[in-house]
Amino acid sequence: MSEKFSPTLRLGDLNDFIAPSQACVISLKDSKPIVKKSDRPQVVIAPKQQLEPVKISLKDCLACSGCITSAETVMLEKQSLDEFLSALSKGKDVVVSVSPQSRASLAVHYDISPLQVFKKLTTFLKSLGVKAVFDTSCSRDLVLIESCNEFVSRYKQANSDDGENSQSPLPVLSSACPGWICYAEKQLGSYVLPYVSSVKSPQQAIGAAIKHHLCQALGLRLHEVYHVTVMPCYDKKLEAARDDFVFDDGTQDNGDLKLTEVDSVLTTGEIMDLIKLKGVDFKDLEESPLDRVLTNVTEEGDLYGVAGSSGGYAETIFRHAAKALFGQTIEGPLEFKTLRNSDFREVTLQLEGKTVLKFALCYGFQNLQNIVRRVKTRKCDYQYVEIMACPAGCLNGGGQIKPKTGQSQKELIHSLEATYMNDTTLNTDPYQNPTAKRLFEEWLKEPGSNEAKKYLHTQYHPVVKSVTSQLNNW
């Protein structure tokens, strides 16, 4: 069984002889009437029917209470290098968005800086026919701004006179990790989902920016644009395939054409495989100028963004909430207190001897269970929790490049963190990002607006776990 997916999405006792159609429990139809039959024996000669082969897509995996089996290569055929190369060969307008975690992984592997990686990767991808290479740090700033607005709104609502009846209670649980979201929908259901932030992940936010704004601004035909993201996590492939991120073309000629915000997701490891496949010496590639339209890069050529290696959600929202709710400007680094282990930390804001804000970082499913129990028993005293399924967070995603010979996973994570934090990247406030400001002015209007809710928010769906009820429909 492949270890690429997060533990929640794997079924450990399956082998490679099990095909998706055998393991999947999703029904072919929503309902089938129950027909009462007589107990008397009957002989019926029915005409032979030519049955169509059953096809199971990746969306089916997200819609049922099954799991990804060892035949995930079949289900993920549209999330592969072959599909990416096929889109290029068909003359599609291919756009690639690269995550900062993937850049850090490539930087450590090739022993160069993340900025050099980005410029060389731009050279490499454009040599294949890619039209533009963007930076998901840009969309992450959009998401952080919207998340700050969401938290302040939910905090005020929860602390109002009618706070007990709030439909958006505290704590707010972050939503950027697809492994955590899939687990919450399939295993935790309705008692946890109301706490989850409705703000999209940076991957889906940049997909929305490209498909719902940039294409229109540049006069591109939506069905000709093929958007690919490079991510540290295989579960991002599942996220991109959700029905929530499918939309209509909107034109008269292609009114029934279904499009997705992200057409395909490639992991960092798959990008390295592509480099090897093309026989390229990556370190010897020239460094191309970066595409500035959706990239956090200064006029001097430096990258900028938040410092958090898993998105910086807790820190950014904590600083904003301290200022917006209590008038406190926090200078310098936040002092996170380590609790059970380095993957479970908390930070508090004290005013006049009273704790007014209490946030937590929670990485890995072992620590996640602790938070879930507290939420379920209504004993969680945090107002916000940044949750990631992988221990050590996104830098340790299953799609990252594996350790070199003689290097331990722990040593690799330390190298990734040092590279990510000590990069030439400038640590900046998302609210000061000129690209984010422009996108709000031209497209989203302001944080919390109807446009922002339409394009930067999503919803979650508790999945019924009863296999019996599903089998009744077969």
UniProtKB/Swiss-Prot annotation:
Localization terms from the record: Nucleus; Cytoplasm
SUPFAM superfamilies in alphabetical order: Fe-only hydrogenase
InterPro entries linked to this entry: Cytosolic_Fe-S_CAF, Fe_hydrogenase, Fe_hydrogenase_lsu_C, Fe_hydrogenase_ssu
Membrane spanning residue stretches: none
Alphabetic keyword roster: 4Fe-4S, Cytoplasm, Iron, Iron-sulfur, Metal-binding, Nucleus
Described function: Essential component of the cytosolic iron-sulfur (Fe-S) protein assembly (CIA) machinery. Required for the maturation of extramitochondrial Fe/S proteins. Required for expression of the imprinted FWA gene, for seed development and is involved in the oxidative stress response in vegetative tissues. Involved in the regulation of cell size, ploidy and cell cycle progression. Required for growth under normoxic conditions and necessary for recovery after hypoxic treatment but its action is reactive oxygen species (ROS) independent.
Subunit structure: Part of a complex composed of AE7, CIA1, MMS19 and NAR1. Interacts with CIA1.
Protein name (Swiss-Prot/TrEMBL): Protein NAR1
Species of origin: Arabidopsis thaliana
